[in-house]
Amino acid sequence: MNPDNYLYLSALLFTIGAAGVLLRRNAIVMFMCVELMLNAANLAFVNFSRMHGQLDGQVVAFFTMVVAACEVVVGLAIIMAIFRTRRSASVDDANLLKH
C-alpha cells in the first residue's frame, strides 16, 4: 500500500479528533477525541519511520503511547471527580469546580 494513503488517513483521523474536541462539550467524548488525535500522530510517526527506514518514528510512537496511557489514568480520575461532584460530565460544569 502507498505510504501516502497512511498519511491521508492520519490527517483524516486527526481532523476528526480536532473537530470532536472543538464541537463536543462532554468531557469523556473530548477525552476520546484527544486520544484519537494522539493515535493519528502515532500513525504518522510510524509511517515516516517506515518511509525513511529508521526506527526513530517508532520509538517516538512508543513513548507517545506510554504518555497516553498515563494521560488516560489521570484524565479519567479527573472526569470521575467532576462527575461525582456535579453529576454531569459536561465541560461547562468543570468550570464551577474552582468555587
Curated annotation (Swiss-Prot):
Spans traversing the lipid bilayer: 3-23, 28-48, 59-79
UniProt GO molecular function: NADH:ubiquinone reductase (non-electrogenic) activity; quinone binding
One GO term describing the cellular component: plasma membrane
Any one biological process term the GO annotation gives: ATP synthesis coupled electron transport
Catalysed reactions, semicolon-separated: a quinone + NADH + 5 H(+)(in) = a quinol + NAD(+) + 4 H(+)(out)
Keyword entries, A-Z: Cell membrane, Membrane, NAD, Quinone, Translocase, Transmembrane, Transmembrane helix, Transport
Superkingdom, natural source: Bacteria
Coiled coil among keywords: no
Principal location class: membrane
Disulfide bonds listed in the record: none
One protein family per Pfam: Oxidored_q2
Membrane topology note: Multi-pass membrane protein
EC number per UniProt: 7.1.1.-
Compartments in which it is found: Cell membrane
HAMAP family: NDH1_NuoK
Role noted for this protein: NDH-1 shuttles electrons from NADH, via FMN and iron-sulfur (Fe-S) centers, to quinones in the respiratory chain. The immediate electron acceptor for the enzyme in this species is believed to be a menaquinone. Couples the redox reaction to proton translocation (for every two electrons transferred, four hydrogen ions are translocated across the cytoplasmic membrane), and thus conserves the redox energy in a proton gradient.
Family: Belongs to the complex I subunit 4L family.
PANTHER family: NADH DEHYDROGENASE SUBUNIT 4L-RELATED, NADH-UBIQUINONE OXIDOREDUCTASE SUBUNIT ND4L
Protein name: NADH-quinone oxidoreductase subunit K
Organism of provenance: Mycolicibacterium smegmatis (strain ATCC 700084 / mc(2)155) (Mycobacterium smegmatis)
Gene name linked to the record: nuoK
